[in-house]
Amino acid sequence: MRFLLSVLPVLCLTVGCNTVPDRPAETSDIHISRLFEAEQGGYAHYRVPAITVSPAGTVMVVVEARASSSGDWGLQDILMRRSFDWGETWDEPRKIVELEGVQEPNEAALAQGLTEPGVTTYNNIVPIADPSAGVVHFLVCSTYARAYYTRTEDDGETFTEPVEITDTFEKFREEYDWKVIATGPGHGIRHSNGRLIVPVWLSDGTGGHAHRPSIVSTIYSDDGGATWERGDVVVRHPELKNPSETLAVELSDGTVMLNIRNESPEHRRAVTIGPDGASGWSEIRFDEDLVEPICMGSLLRVGDALLFANPDSTEPRSPENPEGNWKRQNLSIRISEDDGETWPYKRVIEPGVSGYSDLASDGDGNIYCVYEDGTPSDRGTHVKYLSVARFKIDWIRGGRAM
């Protein structure tokens, strides 16, 4: 695998290489730009975004660009777009990952007829901004079976030669004979002590979509990405039903909170806290304030506050609708000022169809949320756009008190 230089622009989405036309902003306090549109630029869909802000202030968005509608296991590239003016304008989409040679298909997906030989799948790219080193680290997977590390020292113009780190995942085999691995998705974190921490999930690939059943853990680096180690298994199915895409954040006392996607009937996000981001995890609890529509969310620390975003599609359970409404819609952001004990304020970013999201902030007080949005379809949702919202933290505080 190699990471490409900035020499492979993808067909631009609009004349002049700005953004897809902006959707109307909710208020003058939030600016929303559409960066990708389905069936444009040579790809059928754009999914699973991640966002970070480099130490120099460049906003960087990376996405999975899917050539067909065959889901997670189809032909996928990784594209990047960057903004050098706080999200006002964006450069052209560029493919940044390419594998040399023929890629072996994932045996679990092949057994379920989800993929076929010759199909190259790049997935779950994870950025980590590292101000102390002046770099942005990246982890990425291929075929949900191999993992790589690279970094950029010039805001995404070039990347270091990638290093395969699949051996880090091999260390899980003594506890769990995985067939499927995935980093993130979304951004990882740099702890205040310098440790790089990336949540991961693994599956034996025997269940639905070859992504289930599953376990959650972390991998970490204490030497700036040069080497990576595995953490303890945090939780596994059936202790928590199919835990997967997990978010990490450093709390005010230096401990690390994980916020875990799951398929439990509680329909609430699962939370655990550990001292170092790798071990000593507390008993899993459900956060009653944070709805789980079985979808990736995002978690970010900004000063003394925590921000959490995901589709908050709550409709109360009733005799007519005993399960309530757990569709991917009504993307909302909440704020906590007590390390996630309570989430008193909420704002809606996208009231309609919405899905995966990720959060970042810059040194000028701007918060960025990249997210999937779209249109209703026979299957419930259809991701048509990838958009970026920019706002200030006071915009959230001015929202509805919960």
Give residue ranges: language-model regions.
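Positively charged n-region of N-terminal signal peptides that target proteins for export
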Residues: M1-L4
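Gram-negative bacterial Sec-dependent N-terminal signal peptides
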Residues: V7-C12
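C-terminal motif of bacterial Sec signal peptides marking the signal peptidase cleavage site
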Residues: T14-G16
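Asp-box/BNR beta-propeller blade signature and adjacent active/binding-site loops
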Residues: N18-M402
